[in-house]
UniProtKB/Swiss-Prot annotation:
Pfam families: Radical_SAM (PF04055), RlmN_N (PF21016). GO terms for biological process: rRNA base methylation; tRNA methylation. Its cofactor is [4Fe-4S] cluster. Belongs to the radical SAM superfamily. RlmN family. Residues 100-339 form the Radical SAM core domain. InterPro entries: Aldolase_TIM, Methyltransferase_A, RlmN_N, RNA_MTrfase_RlmN, rRNA_lsu_MTrfase_RlmN/Cfr, rSAM. This is Dual-specificity RNA methyltransferase RlmN. It comes from Shewanella loihica (strain ATCC BAA-1088 / PV-4).
Length: 373
């Protein structure tokens, strides 16, 4: 049986340098290879003309460059593109490209499904299958960059920002997420600024501390409720890591970080008559008084079978005004791609559910009980 080839997209620069050293080559060859892979999108070793023929033959014998394929895509009226990415075994994750005047953002997935059970999120209702590999994470950027067009003459890439807000909880896949981020930030990789790579988390506290000890990127936190009682229902990981523990971990992260400029981005999905009253706005402002933040209010994006509705514009406006009275920076997020189910909370993909959550969900949908405000 032939030895399985090494997928070079699974290795950050440290891993590539170790590989070249083991092959009896100079470590700087890793820098050359990364530039071909990530600046120019080249996967054919024969096109890597500043690498000698003998080494190209060695690489072809032992290594490969394999990114997951795009199965299909949909384009929204606002220019947003949702990609279905085939990650093997008949399963797909979803990746969303969001073009704006001053940036082009790619929302990438970190898991096939999600192990958390946030009750308002379509991905969470699908259950969980597995973590994505490094090559499957960076491969989303690589493949979409090919779709959009690498600038092969200049090395300019079509994606300026990456947000890890797709399917899955990134901090439950740190083993693969951290080297993937290393590749995003590396000057020979995708060469993104640490302020242009955002990791979002629902509050896996120990993993947030590990992330802060190893990487400095922008942080977004999914709060969605101003107290533990409601958050236990909406974001069940809160039962293990309550709000005060989560906020303390956020402050520890901010103390180590330059990318966040001293404040975290707080994500708060607006659920009609669930978490959107003015009393809850006051409660949220008091909760965050010791944690510097800017607050993104996200109009809920309904999906089939969801027990929640979207807050009215008037309720969102009143909620926002209360927060601003406390001197907080508040942004009401403009919904993008909702006509193709590409908006926040709508990503579902095609998941073989190891948790059997879909079957459980059918029995539990009518049992969700939250205080109406």
């Amino acid at each position: 049986m032939s030895e399985k080839k090494i997928n070079l997209l699974d290795l950050d620069r440290k891993g590539l340098r170790a590989l070249f050293t083991e092959m009896g080559e100079k470590p700087f060859r890793a820098d050359q290879l990364m530039k071909w892979l990530y600046h120019f999108g080249v996967s054919d070793f024969e096109q890597m003309t500043n690498i000698n023929k003998v080494l190209r033959a060695k690489l072809a014998a032992r290594c490969e460059v394999v990114a997951p394929e795009i199965s299909s895509y949909q384009k929204s009226a606002d220019g947003t593109i949702k990609f279905a990415i085939n990650v093997g075994n008949g399963q797909e994750v979803e990746t969303v490209y969001i073009p704006e005047e001053d940036r082009a953002t790619l929302c990438v997935s970190s898991q096939v499904g999600c192990a958390l059970e946030c009750t308002f999120c379509s991905t969470a209702q699908q259950g969980f299958n597995r973590n994505l590999t490094v090559s499957e994470i960076v491969g989303q950027i690589w493949r979409v960059s090919h779709f959009l067009g690498f600038q092969k003459e200049t090395g300019e890439r079509p994606i300026s920002n990456v947000v890890m807000m797709g399917m899955g909880e990134p901090l439950l896949n740190l083993k693969n997420v951290m080297p993937a981020i290393d590749i995003m930030l590396d000057d020979f990789g995708f060469s993104l600024s640490k302020r242009r790579v955002t990791v979002s988390t629902s509050g896996v506290v120990p993993a947030l501390d590990i992330l802060g000890d190893n990487l400095d990127v922008a942080l977004a936190v999914s709060i969605h409720a101003p107290n533990d009682e409601l958050r236990d229902v909406l974001v069940p990981v809160n039962k293990k890591y309550p709000l005060q523990e989560f906020l303390a971990a956020i402050r520890r992260y901010l103390a180590k970080s330059n990318a966040n400029r001293g404040r975290v981005t707080l994500e708060y999905v607006m659920l009609d008559h669930i978490n959107d009253s003015t009393d809850q706005a006051h409660e949220l402002a008091e909760l965050m008084k010791d944690t510097p933040c800017k607050i993104n209010l996200i109009p809920f994006n309904p999906y089939p079978g969801s027990p929640y509705g979207r807050s009215s514009n008037s309720r969102i406006d009143r909620f926002s005004k209360v927060l601003m009275e406390y001197g907080l920076t508040v942004i009401v997020r403009k919904t993008r791609g909702d006509d193709i189910d590409a908006a926040c909370g709508q990503l579902a993909g095609d998941i073989r559910d190891r948790t059997k959550r879909l079957a459980k969900k059918r029995m539990q949908d009518s049992q969700i009980s939250v205080t109406i405000n």
